[in-house]
Swiss-Prot record:
Chief place where the protein resides: nucleus
Taxon lineage: Eukaryota, Metazoa, Chordata, Craniata, Vertebrata
Protein name: Homeobox protein Nkx-2.1
Keywords: Activator, Biological rhythms, Congenital hypothyroidism, Disease variant, DNA-binding, Homeobox, Nucleus, Phosphoprotein, Repressor, Transcription, Transcription regulation
Tissue: Thyroid and lung.
Length: 371
């Protein structure tokens, strides 16, 4: 059996639709009710498909067509006249149609729906095509109880919806802050009076004051913690300024900075009137050295004078302090400490003159008036 049509159809819209129009015209001309089609429908339902199976039992192509004809014979088909009557609105004999469910059950149980193993080459399909494959509607009654159970179940308690946040105006916030600066806690009459002034409820005023008190306490706590942290960091920095012994040793071992006089600057000798940079520091250093030398000389002179006085006294033990004729100088020095002080002052005068000479020599070195 060839599946290709005998005549090819052009691809225009009018040529494609023309066969449908002709079939509708034929259906309209036939007319009639649904009585004759229903009789044909019932006869076709009871007709066994054995002739079609015997005709197409040879070959693979024959088996396919046998299944096709078997299905066509078992499944009820409506003729064109029945379709035309339905389309034209002739529904007078629709009451004679049997229910679809009964038709399906009768056709499934009868031999017209599934044959007794039409082809031995398809034994596996027969177990899927038994009478038990029909829809069992008796077990569907349990689904109705699910609806009753769902109705009897209590609805789950939904979470309470949070109220929308009320935003205060700038004037209300200003008045609340001004009153908070004056008084952090309000009594009930004061709260009601303030709420009536700014058009709020006493509960809103109460909650605002509670939140603002908590906010101010938290800010003060954060500020105190920040100050404490700054103090700790400052103390750590001050303690670090002293340094450990290793750092002190490193500073002591590092070379000192010594001021060096500048004799020539930019290829020209420096003038005597214009001291070079660092001259003041160098001059102060020279003065300090001169003072140290003078103090050392004073100490040495005092030690010498005291030693000579003691030796004189030990060499002449028989002499009394009154015998000033033999050694008047020694007696005078031993008797009066003021004389020793005068001698030390004379030595200090000499040292001061020596320091002046040192400063002069340093200045000559500094200003380039060299030797």
């Amino acid at each position: 059996m060839s599946m290709s049509p005998k005549h090819t159809t052009p691809f225009s819209v009018s040529d494609i639709l023309s066969p449908l129009e002709e079939s509708y015209k034929k259906v309209g001309m036939e007319g009639g009710g649904l009585g004759a089609p229903l009789a044909a429908y019932r006869q076709g339902q009871a007709a066994p498909p054995t002739a079609a199976m015997q005709q197409h039992a040879v070959g693979h192509h024959g088996a396919v067509t046998a299944a096709y004809h078997m299905t066509a014979a078992g499944v009820p088909q409506l003729s064109h006249s029945a379709v035309g009557g339905y389309c034209n609105g002739n529904l007078g004999n629709m009451s004679e149609l049997p229910p679809y469910q009964d038709t399906m059950r009768n056709s499934a149980s009868g031999p017209g729906w599934y044959g007794a193993n039409p082809d031995p080459r398809f034994p596996a399909i027969s177990r899927f095509m038994g009478p038990a494959s029909g829809m069992n509607m008796s077990g569907m009654g349990g689904l109705g109880s699910l609806g009753d159970v769902s109705k009897n179940m209590a609805p789950l308690p939904s979470a309470p919806r949070r109220k929308r946040r009320v935003l205060f105006s700038q004037a209300q916030v200003y008045e609340l802050e001004r009153r908070f600066k004056q008084q952090k806690y309000l009594s009930a009459p004061e709260r009601e009076h303030l709420a009536s002034m700014i058009h709020l409820t006493p509960t809103q005023v109460k909650i605002w004051f509670q939140n603002h008190r908590y906010k101010m306490k938290r800010q003060a706590k954060d500020k105190a913690a920040q100050q404490q942290l700054q103090q700790d960091s400052g103390g750590g920095g001050g303690g670090g300024g002293t340094g450990c012994p290793q750092q002190q040793q490193a500073q002591q071992q590092s070379p000192r900075r010594v001021a060096v006089p500048v004799l020539v600057k930019d290829g020209k000798p420096c003038q005597a009137g214009a001291p070079a940079p660092g001259a003041a520091s160098l001059q102060g250093h020279a003065q300090q050295q001169a003072q140290h030398q003078a103090q050392a000389a004073q100490a040495a002179a005092a030690a010498i004078s005291v030693g000579s006085g003691g030796a004189g006294l030990g060499a002449h033990p028989g002499h009394q302090p009154g015998s000033a004729g033999q050694s008047p100088d020694l007696a005078h020095h031993a008797a009066s400490p003021a004389a020793l002080q005068g001698q030390v002052s004379s030595l200090s005068h000499l040292n001061s003159s020596g320091s002046d000479y040192g400063t002069m020599s340093c200045s000559t070195l500094l200003y380039g008036r060299t030797w």
